Amino acid sequence: MKIFTKKWFRSRLNSAIKSAGRRYTPQANVTLPINRLFNWLARTEEFYKELFNLGESFQKEWEESSLKKNYAELNIPSRIMNKLENEMAILIKFVATCQQPTFNAIDFNYPLKIIKKADKKIVWLHKFLREKERKLIEGADKEKQAYPTPKDKVNNFLKDVIDIREILNELRSTCGSNYAKITNDRSVLLLGEAGIGKTHLLCDFTEKQIKNNIPAIIVLGQQLQTIDDPLQSIVTELRLTLSSKAFLRRLNAIAKVRNQRILIVVDAINEGDRKGWRQGFQKFLSTLKKYPGIAIALSCRTPFDKVTVPVRSKIVKTYHRGFASHELDALKIYTAIYKLPLPEIPILSPEFSNPLFLKLFCESLEGATIKKKHAQIHAISSGQKGMTNILEDIVIKKGEKIAKSFGFVPKFVWQLIKDDFASSIADKGNGWILLSEAQQILNKHIKNSVKANKFLKALISESLLAEDIVYEHSSKTPKEVVRFTYQKFSDHIIARHLLIKKFDKNDPKSSFTLLDKLGWLFKDEHAIYNNAGLIEAIMIEFPNRINNKGEMFDFLPVKVNGQLAEMFINGLYWRDSKSFNEFTSGWVSGILKQGNYRNQILDILVALATKPKHPFNAARLDNYLKKFKMSDRDLHWSEYLRYQDETSAALKIVDWIERFSGDISEEYALNYVSILKWFLTSTRRMLRDRSTRALYYLGKWYPSLLFNETLSSLEINDRYVSERMFASAYGVVMALHFEGKNDFNKKILEPFARKIFLGIFSKTAKYGTTHILMRDYARYIIEIALLHNNSFLKDADKVLLQPPYKNGGIRSWGEVKESEEDKKNHKSGSAPMHMDFENYTVGRLVDHRNNYDYKNQEYQKVLANIFWRIYKLGYSHEIFKDIDSQISEYNWNSKEQVKTDRYGKKYCWIAFYEVAGHRQDNGKLPERYGQRIPDTDIDPSFPNPPKSEEIVKVNFLNNSDLPIADWIKTGPIPDMKPYLKLNKLSSHKGSWIMIDGYVSQDNLINNRSMFA
């Protein structure tokens, strides 16, 4: 075969994939952020596209800003603006230059210096404009001002300043990233634990390059067992009769002709000649540096990088985190591949971030009947089966396959692991045994030493055991050892062994005291720290050992410190549901009262709450949260929600429902609705909005569940909850009544509407309110029900349904003015009501008031009503001031489009809507609003954003052989006529007339683009 052809590159990839075996599963592709790294390393089209988009956004943000165009209107010093404009022009030119395909290094340090200078001016401008804003407010004329007012102009400039700072930060982040270093160094070392997906990632990227007709080479480290010169060993493995220098010259020449870097990948260098790699590593990299058309990606399993890569090597290291933050995508893909039912809850154990673990989990169920698969998944989802049982199942199933292939009885491997290996590792007390000791264990059972050796290799290759290296004491020479592949399983199986051998259930206290029993684990803080995983595993197993008559904490000779509390919390998710008892509840309650670990344990409780049959299910969480005063709940629960990110149980639950609401059964939906309801207390707008929409999704499938929970939310002392529950219910009613199903309209909607009327609008209503949004949602639900049966309410009751209302909610409003002393005590950002809300939002409730007219008596009364109400709700500046200052500061520095509200603002919004309803009832709202004020918070119809249809499939840039000048001159001009009128669009019949659309195509490698 001719070398360095597309066919040759493909054959080398196929050979590597075959050798990789089960480590590469092409159909199990999960899109991960780390893919971006390889685009930068190889300078693919995606790399140039990313820089193009960044440059376009940067230039647009600056060129279209009021700050650039009209800075003189606010007397901003021209010396500041001239310097800033010059710096921005330099940065725009820099990004434009980066978009030109090149092999050369890009000087990312230069723009970082310019950004630093520009940022100082942006910070100065922000202070300058804030001061101008303050002076305008103090000197505001109560007479009507033309729009835009001076204050409006300042606000527009401030918004521009914030937006420009964000785009500067984005450019700074890009230029200062490891990716920038990698694209210039043309080399990267990918590190990660066993099974994390390094081989899959590298094979997949190489596959993508070759599919795109870009040369790339991958070699597996296991093929390089004897290395004198790493580069020459690679050439030899590729079966080439070339010197390493000739090999690199040929590849570099191809890269130059194509104007495209060629990537050489060596996967798992730890599986080859580690000493050879270590000795030849620096020479290998320095040789490659001479060939600008070539980039290199190496991977190594941790901790073997310590003995394979020189300590002083300056190669950029990056860590593969597996499916972290993408577990839900992975779970959906893998369950489909292995034909398993999708669990009805997100499995929140971090072990599922490991691709190999997820694969082994799926394989352990693969051979079961459909009925058994469903039963197993249901047992895990419902809480009947703990995570430790899952680990055992994986090991048992995998062990049976290995045993069968060697002619042993099915349980041979399981007995070997839980008895022999667990015993030896437990006796060692450090989580491992020497490789030679592992061989001795097998030699006892397998008399043929060759067969015993093969059997050990099988246990390692099938991931039941893992090879590792350790350094003992001051020794500089590592020892080869064997440990269990998964730390959780290792801890669990050793803990079980210790509890059998060293624990006396008739005298638990002495078992934890005596050093020759289990006391050595607790003899001091150092011992506790070093054995954290093992202690956690013993905690998980302990209740079952004493017939659920206590927790390990009840028998310990030492005080329960933070370390032990954290182990207890971490173990809760892993436990069998039957091991939860009254003592568990007591310790959970105790930890919840301590602030240090509250967020951590609440996240575990949220995860457990998804499991219907678990003792700590959603009903229990519901009962717990109902008992709080609103302000206490905000400090305790809403603060937990504020700190949660995409890896938390809370966000994963929302994500799960957004993706899979149609696959969730009624039993689980009931739990989800209850949990989501409590997410609505949050001041994080993103979480609150997504949770409301998730409730709507579930409600469309199970309207009765949502409606019942909506009615029960009226009992909750936080209107943030019931307002959004009614919003989601109203959305469901709008969606389902339109379908015209009598079962829904008669059997579900009508009874719901009747209960709403009795609870909110009747003369004896217990939950009447002036909250204008919630009241409107409730009224519109009833009015839709009346469309289908106008007689289910009496005429007299229909009158009570229409505004203005005489009853319900607060009818006698107090007034409290914020004292001057309180105002002085406000830290930056800590006031409950900031200027925009105070002037614009509250001002909208008062007719004939001009902006900044703070002396308007009716306006002053409304403000006093709102302050009176927020204090009645439990707001206190003293308890929320530090948190609200922190939120204000975070919002200023955050890139998030949807911000987090301060708690003061939350209480102000509730009071605002209640005052608005009261003023509506008394005819005091501005007439221009009609029956609906502009501050409607969320669209209760929950529309899906319109999809962009891609109708042009023709590649107008396919003639890449012509020089650019000829291509521009000779065309051809793209023909758009066929797309102006279509007989069919997607699956929808036409005719369809094009009103608006565009065609944008780029080929950045060949420096061509078109837009029509």
Question: What is the predicted function of each stretch?
Answer:
Residues 1-82, 86, 207, 306-308, ...:
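Extended hydrophobic
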Residues 118-424, 440-454:
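P-loop NTPase signaling cores
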Residues 201-220, 660-718, 724-727:
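Extended amphipathic alpha-helical scaffold segments
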Residues 283, 516-520, 537, 586, ...:
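Alpha-helical solenoid scaffolds in eukaryotic proteins
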